[in-house]
Amino acid sequence: MPVVYYATFVVIACAFFLIGRNFIDLKRHDEGNELMVERAAIIRSGANTFLKREDRAIVVVIGIVAIFYTLIHEAWAGPCMILGALLARSAVEIGMRGGTYGNVRTTNAARVTGAVSRTIRIALLGGSLSGFTVPAFGLVGFTIVFLVSGGARADVTGHSLLFANSVNAITIRLTAYSLGCSLVAMFNRVAGGTYTKSADIAADTVGKKNHGLDEDDPRNVCSIADLIGDCVNDIAGNISDLLESFVATPLACILIAMQTFKADPRMLTATCTFPFVLMTGGLVSTLLSVMFVILKNRKHHKWVMMTDAEFNEKYPDETNQPKYHDVAEKPGFKLVHVGYSLDIEDPSGELNLATAISAIIVMVVGVYGANRIFGGMAIPEFKLGWISPWVAAVLGIVSSVAIGKITEYYTSTKYAPVQDIAKAAIEGEAFLVSEGIAVACKSVLTPVIIIGVSMLVSNALCGTYGIAIAAVGMLSFVGTTVSIDAFGPIADNAGGIAESCGLPEEVREITDQLDAVGNTTAAIGKGNAIGSAAFAAVALIISYIGSYPAADHITTGLIVSVLVGLILGCAVEIYFIGVLTKNTERAAEKLADEAERQLNLPGVMEKTRLPNYNEAIELAADNALHYMLVPSILSVASPIVLGIPFGPDIVIGMLAGAVGTAIVMAIYNANAGGAFDNAKKLIEMGLLSGHPKGSPAHSAAIVGDTIGDIMKDVVAVCLDISIKTMSTVSNSMAMLFYSSSLRLF
């Protein structure tokens, strides 16, 4: 066994250690006053309730699909699928603990310290649990399945329990493992997106529009459901989505390597090993970069001497007082902890630092690994020799960073697009929405060009293997990306807890600052997820084309079938968007009705009694799980419904149409939603002169934010998992389409 696999397991063990260490460190921090503890417990309980209900559905679906794969495809495919689902679900559980324990501690850090640096540290500490689990859990299962199945060998065959078929056991088991991760991601993304955005829209409609309540006013039951939804979608959904991408990209590498280099055992071993070098190097870079930023913001306490009178005047509320010590030498004086002497002004700088460190480490590890693995080999397929795969990986890394920067430009409050949307709000809702649509449309072209150029250059350097390696490079430091992404919902939750508990305005100012950055990091994360999905899906389509004897026939003949499939693929994704949007709207209507009912109960508006949060939480969970059925079936069943009656050719067209449509629409929806959200945030932060919070411009911005909610947190995030699921299902069913389809036309 090559030394890289031993190194992989050592790094994974280090990741598991740091996950435990960071969770213990997180729980050491105080949750705050009694009301803060109570609010956090409700959010934690609600998130757990949703996941438990979702688990019942996941167990049934995974069980049925696993049995089908074991009976029809390969005997060990089902267990591998179950392993993938279990590891994905375990990663979600750990990440959710980081979010639901980190949110209130982030609030308390802002309350007690008044320092952005300390608040960032707690939020990133919670986010690191998500970031470390994604590559660690995804990689450990993938490596075990790969090695136990035989490793880099094209001659390992397997058989189903029902038929005497002969398949490559390694590729079918890895595909099944990836599909297990994919199905969990589909549940979390579709159900989680419906949950969070139905609650968010209902909270805004009932609270802000109908009753003039603040966003996180505790009288509005949907406000608590909204905070739970942030964890469910932006943490659980993001973890499972990017874990599936992290697994799908090396899968594409190995599938293509098995098809392209099966006649050359040495080359097959090298091309199958290199993705593990990049993924292991990426995990190392994540651990080092995230821990560096966490530890960097650890100290720098600032204490100020105050008289008792000054202290009591500044901090009259005993529940919101900072730490202090009575000075024995000076009776009547206190030494008060007021913050940190080296606080930071721009939180995004700390997060960008982690990304930069990760990218540099991966590139260094990658060039060393490429030299050790491919150095000295004569490889005609590699135009630049041994360094070609590394260049392809760097293209993926550069694409990831570039897409992130472009996304930041179109969605951050610091730049013109969001500022222009906020200014358009002065003229009313129609102008604001039109400006937002224009910004979103313009934001699509450059990322698509970057993705396209990277694919073309990677293909020119290493063939189709290069495209898959570029995807691995893009996702190699996914742990850093996920850590930063999880920072967003934790900061958002922290702000919600601060508002619902009536904490001082200074606390909300800090959490709002972090929340605005979190909105941008979430948009960047969505951009990276979409870009990586494009690379992975194209690589999987290429693998699908080469997976059966009729490959040449598919690409040159039956053009009509391919074109029909292309049109159907486009239509399926557009229909998918419509179903998601309508389902979220229906769920929001039901939640809004429940919120109105409870606000009309005696004493709720007067704050003499609390509403029943559990009723709204359970309603949101039931709606989400009910409405996820059709879109999930659409993604899983579409290739099968077309492939079995009409053959494999039409499926190629369907995949191509679906990928093209999904990538463009995902970027459009993600950036539109992020820009609308931060345009509202810009006004709420007082940055639109003469138009404060509560003004007509702010009301218009709320409308834009409500429209953008479904676009970015439901549609955009579900499109990328949809095309990955369709591509993975198609790869696993390719031989069945070829050998058993009815070929009606």
PLM segments and residue spans:
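Hydrophobic packing and interface segments
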Residues: 1-745
